[in-house]
Amino acid sequence: MARLENHYKEKVVPELMARFGYKSVMEVPRLVKITLNMGVGEAVADKKILQNAVENMQAIGGQKPIVTHARKSIAGFKIREGMPVGCKVTLRRARMYEFLDRLISVAIPRIRDFRGLNPKAFDGRGNYSMGVREQIIFPEIDYDKIDAIRGMDITITSTAKTDAEAKALLEAFKFPFRT
């Protein structure tokens, strides 16, 4: 069992039950999935760029990413419907907790000029989204082997009903929010 999963069951659940007055353990918000998404617009010109992005994503997420395709044609961006434009990975259960552990303890402290995560990035339904400008903050990425610095979106989906519950859940996992 992942370290953060144990932490959730032993410390976070009782803490949130006391704080929000839940009657059942099943009411306590929990993490459902973490989605990593990398949009690679330059892949239109060169297929190798997308292949490198897929390899980076596989190293970071620990599983093979799905290549995403354009939903409709946009002449201004020179893309046609069905063209590959990015990749994404959905992490659940043990891999999700392992990734979250690496994100909080290793990757986020390596972000340059980091002043804390934006506490307003919740969507109103208990999910949190953040952007990462460089994939090199993850220790799995070898700086010498990357072709370009790419960013990615990280979305944390939880069963929380409100933003306050979701924020309390992530704070219990020691998320470094800006004050």
Swiss-Prot record:
The keyword rRNA-binding applies. It holds the Pfam family Ribosomal_L5. One of its GO terms (cellular component) is ribonucleoprotein complex. Keywords: Ribonucleoprotein, Ribosomal protein, RNA-binding, rRNA-binding, tRNA-binding. GO terms for molecular function: rRNA binding; structural constituent of ribosome; tRNA binding. SUPFAM superfamilies: RL5-like (SSF55282). Gene3D superfamilies: 3.30.1440.10. GO terms for biological process: translation. This is one of the proteins that bind and probably mediate the attachment of the 5S RNA into the large ribosomal subunit, where it forms part of the central protuberance. In the 70S ribosome it contacts protein S13 of the 30S subunit (bridge B1b), connecting the 2 subunits; this bridge is implicated in subunit movement. Contacts the P site tRNA; the 5S rRNA and some of its associated proteins might help stabilize positioning of ribosome-bound tRNAs. Belongs to the universal ribosomal protein uL5 family. Part of the 50S ribosomal subunit; part of the 5S rRNA/L5/L18/L25 subcomplex. Contacts the 5S rRNA and the P site tRNA. Forms a bridge to the 30S subunit in the 70S ribosome. This is Large ribosomal subunit protein uL5. The lineage of its organism: Bacteria, Pseudomonadati, Pseudomonadota, Gammaproteobacteria, Methylococcales. The gene is rplE.
